[in-house]
Curated annotation (Swiss-Prot):
Source lineage: Archaea, Methanobacteriati, Methanobacteriota, Methanomada group, Methanococci
Entry annotated with the keyword Ribosomal protein: no
Sequence positions that bind ATP: G57, V58, R59, R60, G61, G62, K63, T64
Keyword vocabulary terms for this entry: ATP-binding, Nucleotide-binding
Name under which the protein is recorded: Uncharacterized protein MJ1544
Pfam families: AAA_14 (PF13173), DUF4143 (PF13635)
Domain of life: Archaea
Organism this protein belongs to: Methanocaldococcus jannaschii (strain ATCC 43067 / DSM 2661 / JAL-1 / JCM 10045 / NBRC 100440) (Methanococcus jannaschii)
């Protein structure tokens, strides 16, 4: 009898402890959300009733602060915010979610629920669906596009609106620097603008890093981000055991940014580092890295449906700092930045965004939609490379039968216009600096 009583007392005590813990978590999270200093992003979200608002993107890219931006703008004090990466909620079970919400609603009676990184909870989608069916207004975030997509494609199909968050674009970057963007700049303002552009080219647009001045600290934090993405969003998420081998692969991929890759090329490079990974595993690992937003793979355009042997690889902001040839590759970094800006503008790799490579020419980007556009990226133009880029356009227009197409060459700071004639039709090539192109969207 005594043992049964002791067990009951322990259970009651455990329940009380859990209740106190959950209350602390809710109150702490509410305090964080209310006190957060938010610099608004240039991103809009549709607040459609009865739809679950899904916000996804790279770890540390600004998803949480975008939630705070939404709260500040639309909900003020009428919300509950729960960060499921709070260490006190690690391994929380589905039945405990109900208790957590019950306690949260006793503290703040609201219909507006903000769940940060809820994908770490098993069966989170069923919990969220039930709440949505009960009339709650729900916002969720996650760092994995595919894991979110899997649940969204089943339990939450037709019930969600998705918004992708990437690190800051250059316009937002300047806002974080308190630089006033306008149409014309004085000599001093232009010099300051180019100073910030150089910083953006070097480190990219992760929000926290943008607000730090010390370059050594910037690099340290970037390394923490790289490790966080690698260990939490790749190794842990996919239960990978051969960490040493996949880390070698990660480093190889970063060194190959803005380059064409193939499984065969990667396998040969792994051999040079005395590392063996099967081709099937390489393919799977590329998918894991892509899912975690560490890399992006862009396919060579073709009108024919065929097996893709080669892709061009790009990395998320600033990761080029960990390339061995970083200092020599400003052109590749600029190309990588152009790719990321195109992604921010809503173009999706291998759906309406490609590169074009044939035996005798190459074009960095093809936007293949209602309005077609060819884009070359060249850090600094001279007579030799200008002629090469123009000839590539002439060949691409003929080869791909692009009668009506916009043509751009994006540079560091060169600008102007060139005219070409293809099959008796005149085309205008706009040469535009990256900073101007990125600020006029």
């Amino acid at each position: 009898m005594s043992n049964i009583l002791d067990i009951k007392i322990l259970r009651v005590s455990s329940m009380i402890d859990k209740k106190i813990l959950f209350e602390e978590v809710i109150l702490d999270n509410l305090e964080i959300a209310k006190k957060a200093k938010v610099i608004n992003r240039d991103i809009e979200i549709k607040l459609i009733p009865n739809k679950i608002k899904v916000i996804y993107g790279v770890r540390r890219g600004g998803k949480t602060y975008f939630l705070f931006q939404i709260i500040n703008k639309h909900f003020k004090d009428d919300f509950i915010y729960i960060n499921f990466e709070d260490e006190r909620l690690i391994n929380i079970a589905l039945d405990e979610l109900n208790e957590l919400l019950k306690i949260a609603l006793s503290i703040k009676n609201t219909k507006n629920l903000f769940f940060d990184e809820i994908q770490s909870v098993d069966n989170w989608d069923k919990f969220v669906r039930r709440l949505n069916d009960s009339g709650f207004n729900i916002f969720i975030t996650g760092s994995s596009s595919k894991l979110l997509s899997k649940e969204i494609a089943t339990s939450l199909r037709g019930r969600n609106l998705k918004t992708e968050i990437l690190p800051l674009n250059f316009k937002e970057f300047l806002k974080f620097k308190n630089f006033n963007v306008k149409k014309r700049y004085s000599t001093i303002e232009k010099a300051e603008l180019l100073k910030y552009l150089n910083e953006f080219i070097k480190f990219g647009g992760f929000p926290e890093i943008t607000l730090i001045d010390d370059e050594n600290i910037k690099k340290e934090i970037l390394k923490e981000y790289l490790d966080g993405i690698f260990y939490r969003d790749v190794v842990e998420r996919h239960s990978i055991r051969n960490i040493k081998e996949i880390k070698v692969l990660r480093n190889i991929l970063i060194n190959l940014f803005a380059n064409e890759i193939s499984i065969k090329k990667i396998a040969n490079l792994l051999k040079e580092f005395n590392t063996k990974i099967s081709r099937e595993c390489i393919y799977n690992y590329l998918e894991y890295f892509s899912d975690a937003y560490l890399i992006f793979l862009l396919n060579n355009f073709s009108y024919k449906t065929k097996t893709i042997s080669y892709s061009k690889l790009y990395v998320i902001d600033g990761m080029w700092n960990f390339s061995l040839s970083f200092s020599k590759n400003k052109g590749r970094i600029l190309e990588n930045l152009v790719f990321l800006e195109l992604r921010r503008r809503g173009f999706v790799e291998n759906e309406n965004l490609f590169y074009v490579k044939r035996k005798n020419y190459e074009v960095d980007f093809l936007i293949f939609g209602e309005n077609k556009e060819l884009i070359q990226v060249c850090y600094e133009l001279n007579e030799t490379n200008k002629e090469r880029e123009i000839k590539a356009y002439e060949k691409a227009i003929k080869d791909l039968k692009l009668d009506n197409v916009n043509l751009k060459i994006i540079t560091y700071n060169d600008e102007g216009f060139e005219k070409i004639t293809v099959d008796d039709k005149e085309h205008l090539i706009e040469i535009v600096p990256f900073w101007k192109w990125s600020l006029t969207y």
